[in-house]
Amino acid sequence: MKSTIFFILSLLLMLENQAAGRRLSGSAGAQDPVISRVWAKSQDMEEAVSGSGLTAEGGRGSDREESVGERVSLRQEEFEKGHIRSSVEEPEGEHVSVRREHLEKSHIRHNVEEPEGERVSVRREHLEKSHIRHSAEEPEGERVSVRHERVEKTHKRFHDDSVEESDSASSVDHRKKGHIRFKRQDPIAALAAIEGQDAVKDSLWVKGQASSEERFSVKGQDLVKGHLQMKGQSSLAERFSVTGQDSVKGRLQMKGQDTLAERFSMTGQDSVKSRLQMKGQDSLSERFSMTGQDSVKGRLQMKGQSSLAERFSVTGQDSVKGRLQMKGKDTLAERFSVTGQDSVKGRLQMKGHDLLEERFSVSGQDSVKGLARIKGQESVQSGFSVKGQGSLKGLI
């Protein structure tokens, strides 16, 4: 009697598993290697979804929408488990979510032609788990979030009438966890954060005409390389921070016409190399600070026409080398201070037409070498003081 009941229960369980497999294959497309294609068009009043595969069931449905044209196409191979959901709201509300596991190649393209032109394309190869969500709200609200594990190549492109932005990230090694979130409003605010364990190489390029705010942060354990270029006409505010354990290399170039405010800070344990160039016409304020344990090398060049205020401070334990060049036409005020334990070398050159005030102070324990040159046409005020315990050589 017990064996008969057990046999009946096992048979019912097998039938239930087969029915669940049929439902899953009907909703996702396929479980084994499958080539499927989904088209969704809603230009005037039409939307069609079709799927074909080895063990997939095809379906066709229609939905109506007004005043929005969009196109979504998906193509993938070796699709294990997948869930595709698409819903369209009115007016200008669009929500597309894709969730899949272990697909080899995929291509997603989204085009909206009326009334606003935008383009989002994602191309990746061999990702284990991914989740893509895209929603558009009114007015001009757009959000794209991508979360994936073990991504080889990723490419995303966003195009609009007034602003063109491109964000690309590629990793040679395997990335553990990544999250990219993009928000766009009026004015534009963009946030991009990438966290990796092995190696990360990123390049970000932003161009804007009206106003732009951008934050970029990279955290890694082994090796981090970043390159950032920003150009703007009206106003530009930017923060760039890099934190690493082994080696950090960063380069920053900023150009602006009206106002420019920038902060640059770097902290590392082994070696830090940085180069900063800034050019402005109206007003320029800049702070540059570096802290390191082993070796620090910094170079700063600043040019301005109206007014210029700058502070430069370097603190290190082993060796410090600094070079500062400043040129101005109207007024110029500058402070330069160096503090170190072993050896300090500094060189200062200043040229001005109207008024020039300069202070130079050096404190060290072992040896100090300094060279100061000042040239002016109308009036010059200079102070030079040196304190040291070992030896001192100075030439004015």
Swiss-Prot record:
Residues 177-192 form a propeptide. Transmembrane segments: none annotated. GO terms for cellular component: extracellular region. Residues 1-21 form the signal peptide. It comes from the Eukaryota. One of its GO terms (biological process) is mating plug formation. Residues 194-396 are annotated as: 9 X tandem repeats of SVP-1 like motif. Residues 60-152 have a biased composition (Basic and acidic residues). Keywords: Cleavage on pair of basic residues, Copulatory plug, Repeat, Secreted, Signal. It is found in: Secreted. SVP-3/-4 repeat repeats lie at residues 65-88, 89-112, 113-136, 137-157. To the SVP-2 precursor, particularly in regions where protein processing must occur. This is Seminal vesicle major clotting proteins. It comes from Cavia porcellus.
